[in-house]
């Protein structure tokens, strides 16, 4: 069957499905069967093995990269140690020459460079220490100011609480038992008071 005939047949089937069952999914002629896409079991196993090999190769690459990095660190550490030993040996020779007063001009200039470098390093450390001290001082001052405020509030609350506890119970309850909120004695009404006043006149 040609592709043109297959397309016409597919369109006819889709039109029929739409008229009989509106909203149904249309048929796609170009869609391959899922079994063809997946392939046989041997092909699946082959694909999985290839993926596994790729992953292992990536892991091997990462491991080699990590090992190279560690090797570079070791080599650089050894170089630093070697340079440090050479530097100390040079300085010992220069000290001997300095004690013997047999320093050459080249050795004097080298010593001057070393001294200047060490002085710069010390000054930078002093500067860093000063900055750290200033930061620490600011932090301590900020904390102490905050703590002062908190202490003031707590002391005020504590004083109020102690003052209220020291007062006798009769003073604390400042309301009078015989009077109502309108200041009339309990149980008395306005009519009784007015009768009492009339009798007095």
Curated annotation (Swiss-Prot):
InterPro entries named among the record's database cross-references: Rrt14
Alphabetical UniProt keywords: Nucleus, Transcription, Transcription regulation
Organism superkingdom: Eukaryota
Annotated region described as Disordered, given as residue ranges: 24-43, 147-201
Main location: nucleus
Any GO CC annotation of this UniProt entry: nucleolus
Composition bias type Basic and acidic residues, residue spans: 29-40, 164-176
Location of the protein in the cell: Nucleus, Nucleolus
Bias-annotated ranges (Basic residues): 149-163
Compositional bias segments (type: Acidic residues): 189-201
Protein function: Involved in ribosome biogenesis, probably through modulation of rDNA transcription.
Family: Belongs to the RRT14 family.
Protein name according to UniProt: Regulator of rDNA transcription 14
Organism: Kluyveromyces lactis (strain ATCC 8585 / CBS 2359 / DSM 70799 / NBRC 1267 / NRRL Y-1140 / WM37)
Gene behind this protein: RRT14
């Amino acid at each position: 069957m040609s592709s043109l005939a297959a397309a016409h047949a597919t369109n006819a089937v889709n039109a029929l499905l739409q008229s009989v069952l509106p909203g149904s999914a249309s048929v796609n002629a170009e869609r391959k069967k899922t079994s063809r896409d997946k392939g046989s079991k041997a092909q699946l196993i082959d694909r999985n093995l290839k993926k596994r090999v790729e992953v292992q190769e990536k892991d091997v690459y990462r491991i080699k990269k990590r090992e190279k990095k560690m090797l570079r660190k070791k080599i650089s550490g050894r170089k630093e140690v070697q340079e440090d030993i050479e530097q100390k040996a040079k300085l010992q020779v220069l000290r001997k020459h300095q004690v013997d007063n047999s320093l050459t001009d080249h050795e004097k200039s080298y010593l001057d460079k070393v001294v200047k470098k060490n002085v710069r390093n010390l000054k930078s450390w002093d500067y860093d220490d000063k900055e750290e001290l200033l930061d620490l001082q600011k932090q301590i001052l900020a904390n102490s100011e905050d703590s002062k405020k908190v202490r003031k509030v707590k002391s005020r609350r504590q004083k109020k609480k102690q003052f209220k506890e020291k007062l006798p119970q009769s003073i604390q309850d400042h309301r009078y038992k015989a009077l109502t909120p309108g200041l009339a004695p309990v149980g008395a009404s306005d009519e009784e008071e007015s009768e009492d006043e009339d009798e007095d006149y």
